[in-house]
Amino acid sequence: MTADGYVHHEVMPLAIAPERVREFVITPERILDYYPEPIEGGVFEAGRAIWCRGAMGVSMLERLDESTDECVVMLVTTAVGLEPPYTPEAIRAAATFTMIEDWAVAAEGNGSVLTKTWRDVLAGGEPSPPLADIVRESAEGEGGALVAGWNAAG
């Protein structure tokens, strides 16, 4: 993790329209397309907050107010070892770490380009270089599955 919080950055060409990409960012089924060892997901508040569970834990993705049509900004809160029922309050209280994901979307040809940036990995409110390394390793394996799943669902 760099001094400014940057963890990883990936550019992904997609065969779907930008508005579809923005929709998929806050759709549990599309996040599960690439989520590590996915199990299930759900919606807390349509268009604002979702959750996804995998073998390692459960994550809540919340669309932040700083989002624009060009860039959806998500706060990701991950809790390891949390048991159902999953609620925003329970996930926040049991948070192992949080991070920000920037999902920048631009039209290109008959599709779009998604530029995803992972940043600001925090544990207990403090920067966590070891967790940032784990996030980077996981992020480096997501792009292919995301592109395949989202293009198929597009």
Regions found by a protein language model. Give the residues of each.
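Hydrophobic ligand-binding cavity/cleft-lining segments
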Residues: 1-45
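Residue-level marker for the onset of beta-strands and adjacent loop->beta junctions
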Residues: 8, 46-48, 60-61, 101
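Residue-level signal for alpha-helical context at structural boundaries
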Residues: 38-40, 49, 82, 153
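Hydrophobic-ligand binding "helix-grip"
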Residues: 32-33, 40-41, 58-113, 119-121, ...
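A generic hydrophobic-segment detector
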Residues: 110-154
